[in-house]
């Protein structure tokens, strides 16, 4: 058997799905591809990709709907994506300090990428990015959205080729637990404040990213600097 044939056979016998990057999907995910590719486990990576691809509002809403919170360069359309990128990067720094295992990092990075996918409520066609409103319960509605993604996969693809169905339910729930804890002491449901160190890492990464302008500038935030640097 040639090495090429052996490689093909190994892929077919593997527990992981065979993944060939889709250029059209990659174009949609381009702003977050570096962060998505920080996930080592292919099943978790494909699951995360699939949910992000189906979260149309996620890509067009700002990170702050009132303009009172988050860095000024996140206040317009697409700001939620920039915030998410910063959350994952902050999580990586904290994960390095904790010397997390690869499997722990994958859960943290996936949760950070998905933590705000249902933050905005509005027109699902995304025809008017200004029409969205903030969902204060978004840490919990992510779970319902994931179920919807799984239902879509059942309708349109086989389980063997599905991005969301291939992942085991225990892993999904571990990721969703971290998502539910990302608001920390400001959680709308007290029962989901961070308890474990993974819970806390996701919360701290989100909190630090949302206060990045204060970390850099202090109380006197130089809005011009943030707006100019984002252009």
Segments from the language model and where they lie:
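Polar low-complexity intrinsically disordered regions
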Residues: 1-14, 27, 151-164, 230-231
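Acidic/His-rich, divalent-metal-binding segments that scaffold phosphate/diphosphate chemistry
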Residues: 2-126
